[in-house]
Regions:
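A short alpha-helical cap/connector motif
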Residues: 1-109, 113-202
Length: 202
């Protein structure tokens, strides 16, 4: 076991078995290679899975994850995966434009850029388009300052944002270990969580 499995897969699997919640419309922010979209579509076969990522011509999309030299193959492989199930809808969209979205979602998975200001904006926008009793999950949450911070991969931004929102009683959140192996958890600066949050509707 490499320790690189993520507990978000277990969380999604558990939610798919829930008798108390219905997840008709699901939004994924950050498509990446499409495998998580495929997982969601298999776990929630009767749901609509909307997944968004930057346009393939966007400089950040091209340069993230060192994929610049293999960008065409990356896109081709991703699109093949996304085409496997009919309930997956891919949109090349900068998540900032969710500000103008009208559609509401039961479940939102935030896995785009992890630093300021983008993840903060993603969280606020997601709260605006969340249905009552809906859930938002955020990936790669550091609760202490990571060894290095950047706007894309590693940042304390998610934790700081949701902590302020909870302090004002706008949301409630819980943290779940992202990985369970000792290597990823013994060093607090490497330890990551998945945040599960719900909005307090007044």
């Amino acid at each position: 076991d490499s320790g690189m499995g993520s507990e978000h897969e277990v969380i999604f699997s558990s939610l798919s078995l829930s008798k108390n919640k219905s997840f008709t419309d699901i939004l994924e922010i950050g498509t990446f290679d499409g495998f998580n979209s495929l997982l969601l579509s298999n776990l929630f076969p009767n749901s609509n899975i909307d997944t968004i990522d930057l346009s393939e011509t966007d400089d950040d999309f091209v340069n993230f994850y060192n994929r610049k030299d293999n960008i065409n193959k990356f896109i081709q492989d991703r699109n093949i995966i996304l085409s496997k199930n009919k309930n997956i809808n891919f949109f090349p969209l900068n998540s900032l434009k969710l500000l103008n979205y009208k559609k509401k979602y039961d479940l939102i998975w935030i896995d785009g850029a992890h630093g300021y200001p983008l993840v903060c904006i993603d969280i606020i926008n997601s709260l605006h388009i969340l249905k009552e009793n809906g859930l938002i999950l955020c990936d790669d949450v550091y609760i202490g300052t990571p060894k290095s911070q950047d706007k894309t991969y590693s940042s304390i931004a998610t934790f700081e944002t949701i902590s302020v929102l909870e302090k004002e009683k706008l949301i409630n959140f819980h943290l779940i270990y992202k990985r369970l192996d000792p290597l990823n958890n013994c060093d607090p600066k490497k330890r990551k969580f998945i945040a599960v949050l719900n909005k307090n509707f007044f």
